[in-house]
A protein has these predicted regions:
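Iron-associated oxidoreductase/ferritin-like identity signal
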Residues: 1-162
């Protein structure tokens, strides 16, 4: 039987993932409205990939005979400014990564090998999202917000992530 603290952690990770999905989709729509087409497309993909990750978490919880807490969300942090969007989203993803690491530690200590494997795979997916978001903030720091947003008005200005 899996410890209750691990179940709570899994539901907390799910809550953050569900929040991220909604935040990504809201930001995608704002970006599209502002003509930032390439990053709007990337954000839509982040939301879709986040849905796949949430599905994996739900399957894990169901396999453990637990009811996933899909009604729980954190407060969405949204803004019209692309740099603030990226900052909010990066903070949320980094918080999720921290939660996954804590849960992984408990799983390893409890010798929950199947959970450790599943969470490690999820962690890799989330770290890719973090890499993308942090790289966009780094580009803004390097070239400035004006040049960055001008480049985003082209549909394929940034590389596509999986």
């Amino acid at each position: 039987m899996v410890a209750n603290s691990i179940i709570r952690d899994l539901n907390d990770i799910l809550k953050k993932q569900l929040t991220a999905i909604n935040q990504f989709f809201v930001h995608s729509k704002i970006q599209k409205k502002n003509g930032l087409l390439s990053i709007a497309m990337q954000y839509a993909k982040l939301g879709i990939n986040g849905g796949k990750t949430a599905e994996k978490l739900i399957e894990i919880l169901v396999d453990l005979d637990e009811l996933p807490q899909i009604k729980d969300y954190d407060l969405l942090k949204s803004h019209r400014d692309i740099q603030k969007q990226l900052s909010f989203d990066t903070a949320l993803i980094l918080s999720m990564i921290d939660s996954i690491h804590k849960c992984l530690k408990k799983c390893k200590e409890s010798e929950e090998l199947a959970l450790t494997t599943s969470l490690s795979e999820i962690l890799l997916d989330i770290e890719k999202q973090s890499d993308f978001l942090e790289s966009q903030l780094s580009i803004i720091d390097s070239i400035g917000l004006n040049l960055y947003t001008e480049g985003l008005k082209k549909p394929f200005a940034i590389s596509h992530s999986k």
